[in-house]
Structures are given as structure tokens and as C-alpha cells.
Amino acid sequence: MSATELFARRATLARSVRLLSEFRFEQSDPARFYGALADDTAAMVADLWQAATETTPGGRTVLDVGGGPGFFAAAFTRRGMEYVGVEPDPREMHAGPAAQVGGRYVRASGTSLPFADGSVDVCLSSNVAEHVPDPWRLGNEMLRVTRPGGLAVLSYTVWLGPFGGHETGLTHYLGGARAADRYTRKHGHRPKNDYGSSLFAVSAHDGLEWAASTGALIAAFPRYHPRWAWWTNAVPGLREFVVSNQVLVLQP
């Protein structure tokens, strides 16, 4: 069984439309947006684990690098997984339900994880790589702490995709710095995802190249696309613009 066989059945057009409809609530109602994303992510990881290892995910430890305010903890706990969140910013850790839901939390950087080699079953990073200046150092750390036979799942927003600019919208096609400046003039403050400091241009090509270089890549697909559109991730150039988020699945 391929690593994506189970998740591919879930990757329908209806799912894509449902998730897309939630994006408009990211700023106004983060609990709604991140709650829906967390449920979908936990289901995706469970499917990937079961297909890749032919075992159930219950009781497995998942390390969520960049866990933020804790919306993902409840979703993984409901599936019987032991959740550990890693977040460097205490403001993020206190911006949501981290203190009220299951799981444990560690304040640390994803590029220098305070965990032993091969100490977790699953290491997940969801929409974090584009926020660090060296995303593949993050990826290497994820692989280091994942036990042999486990899974490292790195999902990130592709810069030239439609959501690459985050809250600056499609103006990122004019350039990241220019988009951030336009946002500042309009709103009177810098964007949370500020190009060059908290947002960086990460391409689909670079992610695939890094993953291939590790020798551990077992799957790569566009996270929010229906299964019949996954072919776009195999077309250089095209994938940079039509793949909004790329998932790299690695098995040490």
C-alpha cells in the first residue's frame, strides 16, 4: 500500500471546497478556521501513518513543530495519539486553547528541537516552513527526532501559490516587501506575516529537491487539492502557481 492510498480517498472536491470556505475566517474567527484545519490535518496524518506502517495511529507520539495556540492538540488527542506541541513564541501559546486541551507543550525553536534522536513516532510541521529563514534546517531536525520507520510530515505554503502572501493577498505577486508595505499603508501596522522577517519565499521545487536529497521521501502531494488534481505537483513551473500547499512525507 502506498503512503497516500487511504488519504487519497478522503481528498475529494467537496473536502477542498469545504476547507477553502473556511479560509476567510482565519483572521476573524481563528477558532473556527484552525479547528477545521486541525481536524483535517489529524485525519490526514492518521491516514498516512496507517497506510505507510500498516498499523493504527492510536498511542503513537506526534510532535507538532510550530503548534502555536494548541488548536491541533484536541484533534490528535481524539484519535488516541499522544500530542506534544513545540512553539517558540509565548504569545502564540497563549493566543488559543493550549492550556485547556490535551497534550503537552514545549517552548523551543523548530530548527533546534530539544528532543533526542529517534524519540517520536510522527513529527509534523503544518504551515511553519515558510515562516523560518532556513526551512530545510527545520526539515532535518524533524527527521532527526523521528524514529526509524516513523513519519515526518512537512506541509508548507508555496510562495508563488495563491495564498503565498498570507494576509497581504495576491499583492505578493508584486513582490513580498512591496506587498507588506502596501498592507502597512492600508491597515496602519505591519502584517503579522511580514516578508523578510516572519515570512519567506519557499518554492515547491526547493522542497522536493531537499526531500529527495534525504533519501527518506515516500510521498509528495498538494495538500488541499482533490486527488484528481495531484498531477499538478509533478509539473515544474506549473506547480509553483497552482499548488497552494505542498506536503512532503518522509520515513527515516
From Swiss-Prot:
Pfam families, sorted: Methyltransf_11
Keyword annotations for this protein, in alphabetical order, are: Methyltransferase, Transferase
InterPro entries given for it?
Answer: Methyltransf_11 (IPR013216), SAM-dependent_MTases_sf (IPR029063)
Give the domain of life: Bacteria
List the EC numbers from the record: 2.1.1.-
Question: What are the GO MF terms of this UniProt record?
Answer: S-adenosylmethionine-dependent methyltransferase activity
Q: Quick check: keyword Transferase in the entry? A: yes
Q: Which GO terms describe its biological process?
A: methylation
PANTHER family, alphabetized: 2-METHOXY-6-POLYPRENYL-1,4-BENZOQUINOL METHYLASE, MITOCHONDRIAL, METHYLTRANSFERASE
**Homology family:** Belongs to the methyltransferase superfamily.
Could you identify this protein by its name?
Uncharacterized methyltransferase Mkms_0228
